[in-house]
């Protein structure tokens, strides 16, 4: 699982989901990528599920890059607890994703296998995504 090794403050404010991605919106490492089309909080479990879906489909010969990291804690109070008495414990770690952000990149010799693997990875994510190619970018 992807979680930070250490953090300065254990609990943070919830990040904003407005706006578009300022950087990280081009395929730089691989040949194909998964691009977010709407804002979302993506948890470390969802990132891991998408990574496993890619690796199971391509078997060998390709390379996968994960361009997001869940560095923000999301807290939640237990069920049935009244309001007050402090902020709840950390429930999960999230990556704040804005529209336009490239989430995963991949290079593989066969184009149709790579696109199918990225399509399966997109099904594991909580937001709408599209598959982009490196040569399609301007």
From Swiss-Prot:
HAMAP family, per the entry: Ribosomal_uL16 (MF_01342)
Lineage: Bacteria, Bacillati, Actinomycetota, Actinomycetes, Mycobacteriales
GO cellular component terms, A-Z: cytosolic large ribosomal subunit
GO biological process: translation
Transmembrane residue ranges: none
Domain of life: Bacteria
Pfam families: Ribosomal_L16
Family matches, as PANTHER family: 50S/60S RIBOSOMAL PROTEIN L16, LARGE RIBOSOMAL SUBUNIT PROTEIN UL16M
Presence of keyword NAD: no
GO molecular function per UniProt: rRNA binding; structural constituent of ribosome; tRNA binding
Subunit structure as annotated in this protein's UniProt entry: Part of the 50S ribosomal subunit.
Record keywords: Ribonucleoprotein, Ribosomal protein, RNA-binding, rRNA-binding, tRNA-binding
CDD domains: Ribosomal_L16_L10e (cd01433)
Organism in which the protein naturally occurs: Corynebacterium kroppenstedtii (strain DSM 44385 / JCM 11950 / CIP 105744 / CCUG 35717)
Free-text function comment from the UniProt entry: Binds 23S rRNA and is also seen to make contacts with the A and possibly P site tRNAs.
Family, similarity comment: Belongs to the universal ribosomal protein uL16 family.
InterPro entries: Ribosomal_uL16, Ribosomal_uL16_bact-type, Ribosomal_uL16_CS, Ribosomal_uL16_dom, Ribosomal_uL16_sf
Name of protein: Large ribosomal subunit protein uL16
């Amino acid at each position: 699982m992807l979680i930070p090794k250490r953090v300065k403050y254990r609990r943070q404010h919830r990040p904003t989901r407005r706006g578009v991605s300022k950087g990280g919106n081009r395929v730089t490492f691989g040949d194909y990528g998964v691009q977010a089309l709407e804002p979302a909080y993506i948890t470390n479990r969802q990132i891991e599920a998408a990574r496993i879906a890619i690796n199971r489909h391509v078997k060998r010969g390709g390379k996968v890059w994960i361009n997001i990291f869940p560095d923000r804690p999301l807290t939640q109070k237990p069920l049935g607890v009244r309001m007050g008495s402090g902020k709840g414990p950390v429930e999960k770690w999230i990556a704040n994703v804005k529209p336009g952000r490239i989430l995963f990149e991949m290079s593989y010799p066969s184009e149709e296998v790579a696109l199918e693997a990225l399509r399966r990875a997109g099904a594991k994510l909580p937001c709408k995504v599209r598959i982009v190619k490196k040569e399609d970018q301007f």
